[in-house]
Design a protein with these regions (language model features):
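Short, small-residue-biased leader/transition segments that mark boundaries at the very start
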Residues: 2-9
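C-terminal binding/interaction regions
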Residues: 10-24, 31-53, 63-68, 79, ...
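Conserved mixed alpha/beta catalytic, RNA-binding, or beta-rich assembly cores of soluble enzyme
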Residues: 12-13, 70-75, 89-183, 202
Length: 255
C-alpha cells in the first residue's frame, strides 16, 4: 500500500492476529490482493494515519497521563489502591516529562479555593477559556461552575441569575427538613433539574440549557473529591474531571 511502511519486526495484538487472516482472504477474494502487508500494517499503521495534528495528540496524551495521576491519588485516598499504584503513574509522568502544573484548570480551581477559603471548581472550555465556581449558601462548587460555564457558552452575563432563589430555597427546605440531609446546597443534578424547570418560562435559562452538549470534552478540576452524584453528572456530560485527593469534610464515611 502506497505511503505505508512495512516493518521487519511487527508488533502483534491478539485481535489483529486473529482477524488478519480472515480479512486478508476476503480482500484477496474480492479485489485480487490485500492492501495490508501484516497485522501491524492493518492495525497500528492505520491508526497512525489518523493522526493529522501531532501536537494536538501529544497534548491530549499528556493531559490523559495527568488525569490518571489525579484519579490514582483519589483512589488511594478512598482506599481502592495502594501507594505502589500511584508510584507507577508518577514514574510514567516523569518519563513523559509532565507534571500537575501542566493542568491549567487545576491551578484555576485551587486559586479560586484559596481566594474564597471554600471548595471551588473550574472548567476549561473548548476555546481554552477557564471559568470557575465557588461554594455558596445555595450551591456547591460543582453546580456553580456548570452554571457559569453555560453562561459563558451562551454569552449570558455572569451577573444574571439563571435560577431564582425562590426556586432554589424550597428545594433546600425539602432536602434538609423533609429528607434529613445536612447539606442544603444543591448538587449538580439538582441544579440542572431546577434549570430545566426555569427554562420553561425563562428564555435565558432555556438558552443556557441548550449549551449543555458543548461541555462534552471539556476539562474540569475540583479542589476536593466530589460526591458520587456530582462525579456521575460530570461523567454523563462528557466532562474530563479530576479532583484533589482530599475531602471537604473530615467525616469517617463519605458517599
Amino acid at each position: 500500500m502506497t505511503g505505508v511502511q512495512t516493518f521487519a519486526l511487527p508488533i502483534y495484538y491478539n485481535r489483529d492476529v486473529e482477524v488478519f487472516p480472515v480479512l486478508n482472504a476476503i480482500f484477496e477474494k474480492i479485489t485480487g490482493e490485500s492492501p495490508y502487508k501484516s497485522h501491524t500494517d492493518m492495525g497500528v499503521n492505520m491508526a497512525g494515519n489518523c493522526i493529522i495534528d501531532d501536537d494536538v495528540c501529544q497534548e491530549a496524551s499528556r493531559q490523559e497521563i495527568i488525569r490518571r495521576y489525579y484519579h490514582a491519588r483519589c483512589d488511594q485516598r478512598q482506599g481502592r489502591i495502594d501507594e505502589e499504584a500511584v508510584y507507577k503513574v508518577e514514574l510514567l509522568m516523569n518519563k513523559a516529562g509532565v507534571s500537575i502544573q501542566d493542568r491549567e484548570v487545576a491551578y484555576a480551581a485551587l486559586t479560586r479555593a484559596e481566594e474564597t477559603g471554600m471548595p471551588a471548581a473550574a472548567i476549561q472550555l473548548e476555546n481554552g477559556k477557564i471559568v470557575t465556581g465557588k461554594t455558596s449558601s445555595l450551591l456547591g462548587a460543582s453546580a456553580a461552575v456548570i452554571l457559569n460555564a453555560l453562561k459563558e457558552l451562551g454569552g449570558i452575563s455572569h451577573k444574571m441569575p439563571l435560577i431564582s432563589p425562590i426556586v432554589i430555597e424550597p428545594i433546600q427546605n425539602l432536602k434538609t427538613k423533609v429528607l434529613g440531609n445536612h447539606n442544603p446546597r444543591l448538587h449538580s443534578d439538582e441544579i440542572l433539574i431546577a434549570l430545566s424547570i426555569s427554562a420553561a418560562t425563562n428564555p435565558t435559562a432555556e438558552l443556557a440549557l441548550r449549551q449543555l452538549p458543548k461541555l462534552r470534552g471539556c476539562e474540569a478540576h475540583s479542589s476536593v473529591i466530589l460526591s458520587q452524584v456530582d462525579d456521575s453528572v460530570f461523567r454523563k456530560l462528557g466532562i474530563n474531571l479530576t479532583c484533589e485527593a482530599k475531602y471537604q469534610t473530615k467525616k469517617l464515611y463519605h458517599r
